[in-house]
Each structure stands twice: as C-alpha cells, then as structure tokens.
C-alpha cells in the first residue's frame, strides 16, 4: 500500500534467489505491481536480479482480481519466466492461479519449502489441515509457486538504484468496476490477531468452565487474557472447543471468533513461541502448532495431551493464578 517491499515479498525474493543459485543457467528477474513501484525496486536493488520489471499506475494500487491478473500476466510474458515465485498473500493467492491459466501453466499455493536435485525443482506443502506433507515436482511450465509467509527468512540486502523497466498494460474500463472504498480495522489496542508477534497465546475452553469454587468466571478470564495481550503484544488463538461454545449457548469470551481458531479448521500460525492455556492438547488442536518453534502449556491435568510430547514444557497449575501473576510481573516492566 505504501510502495515499500513488505516482509512476504522479501521472503519470496529470498526463496527465488536461493532457487536461482541452485539452477544451472537460470536468471533472476523481479516483477513489481503497484501505484508506484520505484521505491520497492530500489529497496531490492542489491538482490542480484538481472532485470527489474514494473507495472504501475493508480489502477494497480488496489487489490483487485481484474487488474492484478492483467499486470501479473504482462510481467510473466515480458520476462518469459518458467518459474514464478510470489508471496502467498491473499492478493496474489487470489490472482496468480488465474494468471497461470492464462499463460498455459500451473499454480501451487501454500508452499512451505523448495528444493533442487539434478537440476529439477521440487516443492513442499501440507495437505489435510497440516496432517500430511507432500514433496512433488511439475513438468508443466510456467509454474507459479506461492510461498507461505513465515516459511523463509526474508531477504535483507542493501538498497540502491534499480534500473526499472516499465511494462505497459492497457486496463479496460470493465476491469475497474470493483473499488476499495475504505478500510475497517479495530483499534490497535483491540486487535487480537497479530501474525508477526513473537508469541502466540492460545486460550482453551477451560477458561469458561466452572472453577474450583464451582462458579464460572468468564469476565475475569476475559480481563486476564486481554490484559496479557495488551502488555505482551502477543497474538491470540483459540481451540476449536472454545470457538464452538458460542454456537452452544454457553458462556464465551466476547472477543473470540472463528478467526482466532488454531488447528483443525483453523489457522496454522508460525510464531517463534506458543503458550497454550486451559486446553487439553488434543490432536485436532496441536496439529496447528507444527510450525511454532517453542511450545509451552498451562493445565491442571498432568496427564493431558501436552504432557505426551505435544509441548516442550507443561506447567501443571491454575491458569487463572498463573496469568494473574504474569500480568503483575509485566505491569512492573511494561510502561502504562
């Protein structure tokens, strides 16, 4: 949106550079789309690309399928690319499969790794809600590969002055019928999903169950969780059991939605650290934790799923007491 080279784009660039270095006789060409792509091209000037191609103009500032496919198709044809790597963002996951069809190629989304053996490229991706991993190749070209954000260390080279070649694209009026009229987002303090956070905090259904005094303390649970999120800037996830409670007429955390769900039909985040509270560590939930590097859990049951190898550390304790103490410690070190 601001013309800079975002982290997902720098991750895709790093993957492309790595691939180009391992493929005999290959060349790296960078293609950019946006209202003004010169700043992004200059930011990537030190990546070693042979050419920089850009499609720019007001029509390409918005994320819109009709104009995105026109721009991406023009870049692919101008570059004569046989392998096309792109960030697996919502914008390009929507548009690039259509581009692959237009240029007679194939597309694969949610790619987590790439390898080269005998000068042939293979990709890795997960299936069946992250339960099965597949490695495969394609002979069809062009091959569009959308790399999932968070799977590759982003390129962090030197900026410079790039020689940018502008690729002209005619935009029919019919392609401009869809417009972005504005953005709606919660205030930064109310935002609970933070994909770039260092810590993923997962709340389970136990937060809304009867506590040792026989009563349900949902308001207290909400206060503890939101207080921790504000102080730590962690991202909030939820187990399927907790998210499903809203449809069962039971007490729920008012800020928890299906968008927070981790595992099974939910997201598979890639935060460096994870802390699960008040959930049992059952397989449908822990499957969403495959890419969390350091996993810890708090549960009163010493025989829960977390104790069976699903977490690196299990604290057998009351999550209400633990989080109250954690919030108190954070309050001493975190500015108000």
Language-model segments: which ranges?
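N-terminal glycine-rich FAD/FM-binding segment characteristic of electron-transfer flavoproteins
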Residues: 1-336
């Amino acid at each position: 949106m601001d013309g800079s080279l975002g982290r997902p784009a720098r991750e895709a660039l790093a993957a492309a550079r790595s691939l180009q270095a391992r493929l005999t006789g290959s060349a790296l060409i960078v293609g950019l789309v946006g209202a003004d792509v010169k700043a992004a091209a200059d930011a990537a000037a030190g990546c070693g690309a042979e050419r920089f191609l850009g499609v720019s103009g007001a029509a390409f500032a918005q994320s819109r399928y009709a104009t995105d496919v026109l721009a991406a198709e023009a870049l692919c044809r101008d570059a004569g690319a046989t392998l096309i790597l792109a960030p697996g963002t919502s914008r390009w996951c929507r548009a690039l499969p259509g581009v692959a069809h237009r240029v007679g190629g194939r597309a694969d989304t949610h790619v987590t790794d790439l390898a080269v053996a005998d000068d042939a490229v293979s990709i890795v991706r997960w299936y069946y809600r992250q339960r099965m991993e597949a490695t495969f190749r394609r002979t069809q070209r062009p091959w569009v590969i959308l790399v999932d954000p968070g799977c590759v260390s982003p390129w962090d080279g030197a900026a410079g002055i790039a020689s940018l070649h502008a690729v002209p694209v005619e935009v029919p009026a019919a392609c401009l019928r869809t417009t972005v009229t504005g953005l709606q987002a919660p205030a930064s303090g109310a935002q609970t999903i933070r994909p770039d956070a260092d810590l993923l905090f997962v709340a389970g259904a136990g937060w809304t169950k009867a506590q040792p005094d026989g009563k349900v303390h949902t308001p207290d649970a909400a206060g503890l969780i939101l207080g921790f999120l504000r102080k730590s800037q962690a991202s909030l996830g939820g187990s399927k059991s907790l998210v499903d409670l809203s449809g069962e007429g039971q007490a729920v955390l008012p800020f928890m939605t299906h968008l927070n769900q981790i595992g099974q039909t939910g997201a598979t985040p890639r935060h460096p650290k994870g802390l699960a509270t008040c959930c049992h560590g059952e397989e449908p939930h822990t499957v969403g934790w495959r890419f969390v590097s350091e996993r810890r859990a708090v549960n009163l049951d010493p025989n829960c799923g977390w104790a069976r190898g699903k977490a690196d550390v299990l604290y057998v304790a009351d999550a209400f007491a633990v989080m109250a103490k954690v919030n108190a410690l954070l309050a001493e070190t975190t500015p108000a």
